[in-house]
Amino acid sequence: MDRQKILVVDDENRMRKLVKDFLQRENFEVLEAGDGSEALDVFFAHQDIALIILDVMMPKMDGWQVCREIRSYSKVPI
């Protein structure tokens, strides 16, 4: 059975690692992005993402902007 993919987006490496480690222990496949722009790149490269865990305050593009952009294409839970 394929593991569900979760995209974790946070500009703080420690937070991404903490969330990633927890999710991997629960047998999820974790994709990471360090800012909003990178999050969109990862999202559009992997259309089978089951969930996005998204920080709101990030450089380049904040979480609200990312959420609006993704919502125009998908109803993936954020």
Q: What residue ranges belong to the model's regions?
A:
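Non-catalytic signal-transmission and effector/linker regions of two-component phosphorelay proteins
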Residues: 1-7
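The short loop immediately C-terminal to the conserved phospho-acceptor aspartate in CheY-like receiver
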Residues: 56-57
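Conserved dinucleotide-binding and phosphotransfer motif residues
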Residues: 25-26, 73
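Acidic, metal-coordinating helix/loop segments flanking the phosphotransfer/catalytic sites
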Residues: 32-51, 69
